[in-house]
């Protein structure tokens, strides 16, 4: 088990509390993604975590498969779904490795992967797999933390690393857009959202021809 999987397995029960600091940013990203969703779409979500994006978007499409590499994260997501009491037709959960997906080529209309590419040792492999399972012209939603500014950002990053979390790439907003564009996608949106401490790149891209 790699170090980051150990981290997520260990801290899954308190992840949602930790992420409360970016709730407003997540809400804004959901608002920006909704216009790109259609009722007949089949969507795959990678690295769903505790379901913070899952539960605000999954009811907008035909089917939504929420997956994560860390089984404890999936457990928390399922528990949150059951406690919520709202039935989302077409929502399913499964444990999957984003770099080695079991699905057939061109299986999905869109793929969501939030705050995960920067913590993968080989994000290129994940993007290759995402391209493979996306239909021609399929969409990628990849909101991702990018490099912030100031002492508060440095302190937050250092604190997270102290507890065992590792970011393999630390791109600026523009660098992340270039990275996505270099791996088989046409970038449609990449606006930076949030403050200096925990900014997010609202990445929306389309599978290149």
In which residue ranges do the predicted regions lie?
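A short acidic, Gly/Pro-enriched loop at the edge of an enzyme's catalytic core
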Residues: 99-110
């Amino acid at each position: 088990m790699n170090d980051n999987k150990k981290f997520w397995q260990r801290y899954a029960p308190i992840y949602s509390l930790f992420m409360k600091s970016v709730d407003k940013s997540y809400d804004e990203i959901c608002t920006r993604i909704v216009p790109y969703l259609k009722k007949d779409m089949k969507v795959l979500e990678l690295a769903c975590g505790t379901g913070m994006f899952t539960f605000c978007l999954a009811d907008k499409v035909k089917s939504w498969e929420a997956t994560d590499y860390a089984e404890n994260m999936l457990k928390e997501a399922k528990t949150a779904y059951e406690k919520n009491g709202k039935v989302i037709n077409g929502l399913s959960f499964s444990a999957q490795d984003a770099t080695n997906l079991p699905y057939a080529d061109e299986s999905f209309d869109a793929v969501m992967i939030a705050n995960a590419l920067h913590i993968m040792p080989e994000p290129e492999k994940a993007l290759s797999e995402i391209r493979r399972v996306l239909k021609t012209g399929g969409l990628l939603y990849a909101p991702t933390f990018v490099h912030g500014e100031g002492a508060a950002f440095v302190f937050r990053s250092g604190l997270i690393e102290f507890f065992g979390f590792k970011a393999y790439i630390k791109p600026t907003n523009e660098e992340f857009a270039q990275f996505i564009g270099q791996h088989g996608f046409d970038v449609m949106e990449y606006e930076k959202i949030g403050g200096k401490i925990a900014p997010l790149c609202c990445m929306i891209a389309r599978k290149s021809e």
